A protein has these predicted regions:
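Conserved glycine-rich Rossmann-like NAD(P)H-binding loop of the short-chain dehydrogenase/reductase
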Residues: 29-44
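The beta1-alpha1 cofactor-binding region of Rossmann-like NAD(H)/NADP(H)-dependent oxidoreductases
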Residues: 58-69
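Conserved mid-core segment of classical short-chain dehydrogenase/reductases
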Residues: 67, 91-100
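Rossmann-fold scaffold of SDR-type NAD(P)-dependent oxidoreductases
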Residues: 12, 81-88
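NAD(P)H-binding Rossmann-fold N-terminus in SDR/SDR-like oxidoreductases
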Residues: 17, 21, 91
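Flexible N-terminal pre-Rossmann segment of NAD(P)-dependent oxidoreductases
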Residues: 1-7
């Protein structure tokens, strides 16, 4: 991975396995990371594991609060944002046959 030293990055869906791996790689590349997800205990585990990341609990399905979340996350990262890794996923229905 390229050098990301000093880059401010938000990772959504960070409390799951894929999010954990993304954060690990970004951390190795030197990025400043804010991890978000719905399970605060998992986010706190990430903070303990990597030490230098910031965490912010957020449920991406609250679409009316996304702008506020990004503003708060950007402030936590020092006022600038370089990238958002949209790893969080939501689904409205669990039957693939009904999804289009």
């Amino acid at each position: 991975m390229n050098d990301l030293k000093g880059k401010n990055i938000i990772v959504t869906g960070a409390s799951g396995g894929i999010g954990n791996s993304i954060i690990e790689k970004l951390n190795q590349a030197g990025a400043n990371i804010l991890a978000s997800g719905t399970r605060i205990e998992k986010l706190e585990e990430l903070k303990s594991k990597f030490g230098n990341i910031k965490i912010l609990k957020f449920d991406i399905s609250q679409s009316d609060k996304i702008e506020e979340f990004v503003e708060n996350a950007t402030k936590e990262l020092g006022g600038s944002l370089d990238c958002i890794v949209n790893n969080a996923g939501i689904t409205q229905d669990n039957l693939a046959i009904r999804m289009s």
